[in-house]
Amino acid sequence: MTSFSAPGSPVDTVLLTSPAGAGRTEAIRIFEDLGYLCLNHVWPELVPTFLKHYAPIAPRLVLCLASRPEADAQAGLIAARVALRSLARTTVHVHLDCPEGVLLSRYALTRRPHPWFDHGKGLLAAIRAERTALEPVRALADEVVDTGPLELAQLRVHLGALVGGRPTELPVTVMSFGFKRGVPADAQFVLDIRFLPNPYYESALKPLTGLDVGVAEYVFASEQSQATYRSLLEFLRFLLHQYRQDRRSQLLIAIGCTGGQHRSVAFVERLSGDLAAEGFACRPSHRDLAVNRLQELSR
């Protein structure tokens, strides 16, 4: 038997089994996002060979075992467990499953042939044949996950909690930019603060940036700026809590002013600091600041 990890402790290796259509591809993507090297459609008899090559270089490994009509699924799984036990890796066997009606409807939406399909018997017979062959495998699993009622976000939460050991914090970048050089193409949210008082028209502040205290004080001196900031902080606080629960992989929030030197820089610095203080993995970035400085020096 493989050794199931204690609750909350990290899992080195995941043995993943499932009938076709039960969510194997989505599960592999989730494990990849969690930092696992995923090997899909591995024949059980080849597990020792894969482990010999990949175990030394992959501290986190997912072996998704293939089910084939001509193979003994239970014998193959037991052989895979024996190979893993010899390496003393902390392993969990996860079996994905769902009702045959769900599998049938999922295959109705795809053009891919079922691996157990027999032209003389039809799709439902193929689904039933594979699930019957996998019943002994399902019985040996440490965790059986019914993907039928689960949305993708729920499956992500479930599998993440199952393997444990690594927080899935949402990395957030808050970026300043200037509209005159275009909007960042990879931003999920773009906020325009060009309506706020502009330090550019103050001769003493024009050569400075939003990183300078004088510029920041000017930007936030007006009630308009203060109200904007409070509303923006409250909105982002709500937004990040929602995305954190949805287990997004990353988020880029772009805040723009005309040149990306004064107002947006001051806002980004303050926002990223306040959000980081509340526990979000937030960092500031200033896309156009270096370009602006080079242009000033070249004049």
Swiss-Prot record:
It comes from the Bacteria. ATP binds at S18, P19, A20, G21, A22, G23, R24, T25. Pfam families: PapZ_C, RapZ-like_N. GO terms for molecular function: ATP binding; GTP binding; molecular adaptor activity. Keywords: ATP-binding, GTP-binding, Nucleotide-binding. Displays ATPase and GTPase activities. Belongs to the RapZ-like family. This is Nucleotide-binding protein glr4163. It comes from Gloeobacter violaceus (strain ATCC 29082 / PCC 7421).
